[in-house]
Amino acid sequence: MSSVDAAWLGMEDPTNLMMVTGVLMLDGKADIKRLRVLLDKRLAPFGRFHQRVVRPRTRGSQPHWQDETRFNIDNHVSHIALPAPGDDRALRELVSELMSTPLDTTKPLWHVHLIDGYGGGSVVLARIHHSIADGIALVRVMLSLTDATPTARPARLRGDKTTSAGLLDWLPAAVGRGIAVGERLLDNPGKVADYARLGAEGAFRLGRLIALPPDPKTVFKGELGRRKRAVWSSPLPLDDFKLIGKAFGATVNDVLVATATGALRRYLEKRKEPTAGVSIRASVPVNLRPLDQAHKLGNSFGLVFLTLPIGLVDPVRRLRSIKKEMDDLKRSPEALVAYGVLNLMGMAPVEVEKLGLRFFGSKATAVLTNVPGPREPLYLAGRKLESVMFWVPQSGRLGLGISILSYAGGVMLGVATDEGLVADPEKIVEAFGQEFRALRAVAAKKAKPASKTSSRLARSVTW
């Protein structure tokens, strides 16, 4: 096991489980037998899904992966029914419960649940430990289960490995755009070697990270409990986010992050919490994996701290402030420095690692990720994939996770919170929609009268 993978394994805590949780909602009832066969066949190329973690018996030794000689797919697939009335609230409760439940550490660290009774369709919920891979790899794994058509057969990838034809069409472009909001910050993962030579700049950035003051105390920070809450929005039109970006010379990423920041401000205001002059930081993943290694599992990403200017009242000023911050981070080797810190933490004794987590965790309030997903609808086990949402773990002592995902022309927001800190994350989701509509209204006033070229202009905006 690599030192960075070991670092994520060591972050596991009963109050903050290191799982990536994904929810895929289907337009009809899926067949459990077909799903098991699909999982068994398409996860087979990823050997890590057939390996369990063996923890060291001697102090100072690294954990390692060991093949599960008696691997049985049935140990990793559950078929359950959603409690009545089978609505969004019932699904949110179930997702929250499973997100709060640890994986079985005696087996490979992943599990898939087929949930029936959600309206007229099924839901596939996947829980995968972060030590297996980072977000870019795990999104690839989850979408490798999908197809471009209801009856598509698996396409060949790298010799005898199989994956989805729908995924093959989408993955290279997604990796090129950057699979997460931070991963867009590093325009070319191949720059890793160039940045690695910038020793002086790296030392400066490390000093900057160490010198950052702790994030201010807000309702989003505090002692964590074991119960988490997971919620998500309905899809919002991606083209509208593009038009907002066009109006203010910003990328879609800039607009999405600004909208999320405005939602947090609105939430604090409704709780009568102070916002004047308040800025918080989000820990943002940055992809460091070269494009020709996008198929590999493992953790190959760094983290940057992105300032979210909650205290700015004007939504346009917030957007411009975030754009400037993200533009600055694009030219920074901060993600590589953070990757190096994670590498060292993974090699350190557990006590030292936990001290490091506590130290760096105090400097942020949230984890923020944004995945530009497939632009066309996909199918899973013969059923159309209506919507997708995921949540990454909140590393260290963070209790707020913000996930943004685009799929088939829509954008959804997912929020995961510690129930003891924020028991009503659905209010943040509502505020996201309100902030989006406010930005859209301002952009409409600024834009020229609508023309036939508006949709073309929207498509021209970059991530």
Residue ranges and their predicted role:
Residues 1-4, 11-14, 19-398, 402-463:
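Soluble acyl-CoA-dependent acyltransferase catalytic core bearing the H(X)4D motif
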